[in-house]
Amino acid sequence: MTTPGGRDDDAWGQVNELFDTLDKVRKLLTDPAMSSIRLVVNPEKMVIKETQRTYTYLNLYGYATDAILCNRIIPPEVTDPYFAMWKANQQDNIAYIGEAFGELPVMKAPLFGHEVGGLDTLRKLADALYADKNPATQMFDGQTHRIEGDSTTGFTLVVPLPFANKDDLDLYRSRDELTLRVGPYRRNIVLPYALWDLEIGDV
């Protein structure tokens, strides 16, 4: 084809090739057997809230999260009274992280006395987070959505959306696809053939 600039090349072919590549990357990243995400959070309220929001949208788009890495925890050997309130607040926030993210394992790393850089410090960080565990091991195997029920009792599509507000949810339907919207974000879920002719009962 001829592009507006007058060059004769297979521009559409290049565009299609790009989309094919992006689709392969998406399939790789959304396959929990191949890829998973670990969210890093500091034990601070604002950071926790933003991490919760990120986790919601990762679930919405089908990306598996297998662990929470809690970073920059003031270690017990810091006994200066100046940090007493900071340490107490961190412990409260760490407890909240454990509650908020449900079954996801929470691994903890201390606040080092210097910037983390270089192999020696990175090894110390890895030891603190993983100890004897293999970092390449999948820490949690959860589903981003599943279908429950049967033709007699009805089917339920379950999409875990931690921390999402029901008032922010919208659901649209075409014959073979559901579009789920959470605030400004949306996800399209392709339905199996058995559900194509069924009506949505409730959300």
Where do the PLM segments sit?
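Switch- and interface-adjacent substructures of P-loop NTPase systems
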Residues: 1-34
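Extracellular/lumenal and peripheral-membrane lipid-interaction modules
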Residues: 3, 7, 185, 196
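C-terminal lobe/tail of nucleotide-utilizing enzymes
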Residues: 22-164, 179, 184-186, 190
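Beta-rich strand-turn-strand
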Residues: 167, 196-203
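Beta-strand-rich binding/interaction modules
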Residues: 167-172, 177-181
